[in-house]
Amino acid sequence: MPNRTLLIAGNWKMNNDVAEAAKLADELAQALPEVPAGVEVLVCPPTIDITTVHDRIQPAPIALGAQNVYWEAKGAFTGESSCDMLKSAGCTYCIIGHSERRDYFHETDEDQNKKAKALVAAGLVPVFCCGESLEVREAGTYVEHVVNQVKAGLAGLEITCPKQVVVAYEPIWAIGTGKTATAEDAQEVCGAIRETLKEMFGEELANGIRVLYGGSAKPGNIAELVAKPDVDGALVGGASLKAADFASMVVKAGE
């Protein structure tokens, strides 16, 4: 297996006002003054909190990302943020394609593709999310479903380095439910994603692209997950809102 740097990414979702974000950022900076070799740490707060977190989390080795972006550079797009805006606030990553964006805001694969291309062109790293519903899982077509999401969402993406994109597999039935796909389940789909990336970008690039697992990832299961050959970290929801839990995941991933 290629030597890929693990990525533990926290998605705060719509949690923490500015004061709460400052407190959590302070706690994370104190808990993670350094991180284990071979592990990278990322937090993605709500847009309103990005500048606060950026200022408070330094000099801890924690990267900053956003939870959403719009593909146009500027203009009459009320409520949206551009890639350059996110960069100017200190972001280096951005989550796209999360099931909550797809389900609640009716975002399509085409939307994710536009976002991915805009982010890469701006020098930001898209964390492209994909995953199946319980209905698709029970129908047995989940691998095909996820592979099709990857093909559509990353079609035509021009990358020259594997660190220019991250893929996060999040089975929808495991997000915020306490249910977790087994490490074997995660490996099955993450492995299929890797094979798809090889078809799209060639073996050398695909072997370096990080594929994360998300969906009730927590301190108790992170070590088992990242032990699998095609699971390169986690996109963490609820556990990322508690500094002690998130820091514990980072440490355990690096053991």
Give the ranges of each region predicted by the language model.
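Active-site loop-to-helix "anion-binding N-cap" substructures in soluble metabolic enzymes
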Residues: 1-255
